Amino acid sequence: MNYKKSAENILQALGGEDNVEAMTHCATRLRLVLKDEGLVDEKALGDMDVVKGTFSTGGQYQVIIGSGTVNKVFSELEKITGKEASSVSEVKTQGTKNMNPFQRFVKMLSDIFVPIIPAIVAGGLLMGINNILTAPGIFYDNQSLIEVQNQFSGLAEMINIFANAPFTLLPILIGFSAAKRFGGNAYLGAALGMILVHPELMSAYDYPKALEAGKEIPHWNLFGLEINQVGYQGQVLPMLVATYILATIEKGLRKVIPTVLDNLLTPLLAILSTGFITFSFVGPLTRTLGYWLSDGLTWLYEFGGAIGGLIFGLLYAPIVITGMHHSFIAIETQLIADSSSTGGSFIFPIATMSNIAQGAAALAAFFIIKENKKLKGVASAAGVSALLGITEPAMFGVNLKLRYPFIGAIVGSGIGSAYIAFFKVKAIALGTAGIPGFISISGQNNGWLHYGIAMIIAFIVAFGVTYALSYRKKYRNIEA
């Protein structure tokens, strides 16, 4: 492959050197900030053998090339343009300028929660393993594994502690990540999180039970002002708002406190004032809002049943195209942290249905495509990848390009999601939203069985609808 020629052709299709403001690359994609995306020649890019697909998200225009090749093409781009590679964070910052306020808000949530996902995934998957060990009826009739094989009980207890830690101490993770994102000191953010989950406080999990039972809530009395001594274990919204206040106060103090006293007074005053504000006003208010949000979404999912699942499943892929799905991470984290009352997250199973359907549609396109060997090759690899939870190549490289597979995919996603919602399948962990996602699913009410059946439904419907649409005259000769 002539990488120099490929780079020249890509640059020309992007609108020329003057249209590129910043550029970098990841493992598989060129990531660019363009002055005017309207100048991009999508057809020319699609005709290039080296390009597997393109899409625009988060203020960035991304060109899918593939592992092992993208770095070589990018190296030639650097030589041609004379521009050095920007860091990924610099490209993200530059791309943010092209976003509207809502897109910036979604990106903010993504920036905060994506770094802590590994901890949430680890805790959630360990929770799944613990459920396998402790749930009755999996290995023995009406009995759990640890009831029959008592030697596993110690292991189950240990895993249960490991699993609960990331959720119970979630404010510490959020505090660190959010403070960093808001321009404050990340360690002060973590310290604030530690304060909100201090063991001397009444646990956030015990607080609703105490209210329901009419028990007295412990409180501080500050000059006649009673402040509840209640923790914020597993809480998302209170910690987000509190950390924003902390970072704002910290940055303000650093502007007015003399340098010689900065390291002494700024942390002291920032933590003291934010802690007081949080326990007095912000915490109780945002805790209530958080309960309303998670309870409201859970009620909609359970009340809406199959119809609600159908609508969400139909809309999920279009939401992904806009990038708004990143905002779901915060909601999912709260739903899973409150799984004792919510039962877990309904978003993960529906995301899986969308991914499976995108993969099925891409595989259907593989069998339909006759002339375009390049697209046929992309469809086969992308289809398998989507079944395993990675949908970008399938969605942007095949299904949206041909249009009718995307229609088939959203129909399959809708039907599969309707089944999921009807049987109230939920996830107790974040993980890979695809075939490997079984371990993230709650085993209650035959959740694993219904999850598997729903994936089969989504696959068959998406594959079948895509194949049927290919015979329609308006789509018959489309091989972009």
UniProtKB/Swiss-Prot annotation:
The keyword Kinase applies. Its EC number is 2.7.1.211. The active site is at C26. It catalyses: N(pros)-phospho-L-histidyl-[protein](out) + sucrose = sucrose 6(G)-phosphate(in) + L-histidyl-[protein]. The phosphoenolpyruvate-dependent sugar phosphotransferase system (sugar PTS), a major carbohydrate active transport system, catalyzes the phosphorylation of incoming sugar substrates concomitantly with their translocation across the cell membrane. This system is involved in sucrose transport. The PTS EIIB type-1 domain is phosphorylated by phospho-EIIA on a cysteinyl residue. Then, it transfers the phosphoryl group to the sugar substrate concomitantly with the sugar uptake processed by the PTS EIIC type-1 domain. The EIIC domain type-1 forms the PTS system translocation channel and contains the specific substrate-binding site. This is PTS system sucrose-specific EIIBC component. The lineage of its organism: Bacteria, Bacillati, Bacillota, Bacilli, Bacillales.
